[in-house]
């Protein structure tokens, strides 16, 4: 797990609190993804991601309230310097113990803490393609996709947002699930560019579609893994050819089998593991979804 030391002294010097500040968040990260990350270090009571009220864009930082001091201490220990995408997160105790009462002055303080790092990073605006800085913003999504139904709040008592998705899908009759897959397939064929944009803005829809395909017996796990792996494989095929020629295939197969076993651990099994192991498994799952390990 890649890490980088260092966090703003103004944050680090705050006394221990159940509320922590998490900064230097890539702008394409949604509240659900940050909640998923934070839930791996301890039970989350509340999460508030900050958005610019004028543009709806993420400010690149959030406040997270954990259930107890032990969990918030674990977050500071494990998330400060943690690499998320191309950024290294900043995590420290917040000066405000009430996540809903962050004043304008305090927001400006955290804007200053977070600003230099994000302004100098790789989060520059790009007028071409989807506006990732608006990802997860309800107003932006409703304008781009007016027929998209409003979502529901994530139940923070669930272990992960993935469990929330499974719970909601289980409430739908099989006929409704199959109808969704049929309609979504028809729409993506008619509007391929919009479909790509929607899935980039709402990555949870990819999980919904994959789960429906699996639970309805339309696909198997082995059918879906190559689809997630293909873009990464195509991008790095040239570089990997020379490496694969000198690596023992038996060793590669053994590594892939071990990785597959780890990725098949359920949330209950993961929840009893130590903090560092939970974070490592979460990291592996994110890399697998991005196709960094290729097909297996």
Curated annotation (Swiss-Prot):
Keywords recorded for this protein, A-Z: mRNA processing, Nucleus, RNA-binding
Biased composition range(s): Low complexity: 100-135
Source species, domain of life: Eukaryota
InterPro entries cross-referenced by the UniProt entry: CSTF_C (IPR026896), CSTF_C_sf (IPR038192), Nucleotide-bd_a/b_plait_sf (IPR012677), RBD_domain_sf (IPR035979), RRM_dom (IPR000504)
UniProt xrefs under PANTHER family: CLEAVAGE STIMULATION FACTOR SUBUNIT 2 (PTHR45735:SF2)
Complex formation: Component of the CFIA complex, which is composed of RNA14, RNA15, PCF11 and CLP1. Interacts directly with RNA14. Interacts with polyadenylate-binding protein PAB1.
Described function: RNA-binding component of the cleavage factor IA (CFIA) complex, which is involved in the endonucleolytic cleavage during polyadenylation-dependent pre-mRNA 3'-end formation and cooperates with the cleavage factor NAB4/CFIB and the cleavage and polyadenylation factor (CPF) complex. Binds to A-rich RNA sequence elements.
The name this protein goes by in its record: mRNA 3'-end-processing protein RNA15
Organism, as annotated: Saccharomyces cerevisiae (strain ATCC 204508 / S288c)
Gene that encodes it: RNA15
